[in-house]
Amino acid sequence: MPPKKKLVKTFTLQLPAGQATPAPPVGPALGQHGVNIMEFCKSYNAQTESQRGDIVPAEISVYEDRTFTFVLKTPPAARLLIKAAGVAKGSGVPHMEKVGQVSRAQLREIAEKKMADLNANDLDQAEKIIAGTARSMGLNVVD
């Protein structure tokens, strides 16, 4: 069994799917740890090509020998809610100004998609988490 590599740093980048380039924010974030930036960009773009148009977070682990691994997460709940509601962005004052609405069915669909990344035991709890995010963005939740 090969010896384990020593983990130096773990961080998350939210990047457009299939469009990672060595320009900021990718270049500086990886460059300061001595990681091969082009290698990351090529593998990230290849793995996220099918999700173009979404923001896909990547959790990157950098090791002592300057190698790296990354795990793709699901798109942020806020992005999925904006897409479901069909609005440009959330409200600046969500408790006073509502910018759109989402249905319970849409919430459940988003919760199913996000379930792996949420700290929830079942789908109902995940749906409540997503509903809270929707309310904090100025979206009404309708039945």
From Swiss-Prot:
Cysteines joined through disulfide linkages: none
Alphabetical UniProt keywords: Methylation, Ribonucleoprotein, Ribosomal protein, RNA-binding, rRNA-binding
Matching entries from Gene3D superfamilies are given as:
Ribosomal protein L11, C-terminal domain, Ribosomal protein L11/L12, N-terminal domain
- Per its UniProt record, what InterPro entries does this chain match? Ribosomal_uL11, Ribosomal_uL11_bac-typ, Ribosomal_uL11_C, Ribosomal_uL11_C_sf, Ribosomal_uL11_CS, Ribosomal_uL11_N, Ribosomal_uL11_N_sf
Q: Which GO terms describe its biological process?
A: translation
Q: How is it modified after translation?
A: One or more lysine residues are methylated.
- What domain of life is recorded for the organism? Bacteria
Q: Name one GO molecular function term.
A: large ribosomal subunit rRNA binding
Q: Does the keyword Flavoprotein apply?
A: no
Read off the CDD domains from this record.
Ribosomal_L11 (cd00349)
One GO CC term of this entry?
Answer: cytosolic large ribosomal subunit
**Keyword Ribosomal protein belongs to the record:** yes
| Function statement | Forms part of the ribosomal stalk which helps the ribosome interact with GTP-bound translation factors.
Note the subunit structure: Part of the ribosomal stalk of the 50S ribosomal subunit. Interacts with L10 and the large rRNA to form the base of the stalk. L10 forms an elongated spine to which L12 dimers bind in a sequential fashion forming a multimeric L10(L12)X complex.
> According to its UniProt record, which protein family does this protein belong to?
Belongs to the universal ribosomal protein uL11 family.
The name on file for this protein is Large ribosomal subunit protein uL11
- Tell me the organism: Salinispora tropica (strain ATCC BAA-916 / DSM 44818 / JCM 13857 / NBRC 105044 / CNB-440)
Q: Which gene specifies this protein's sequence? A: rplK
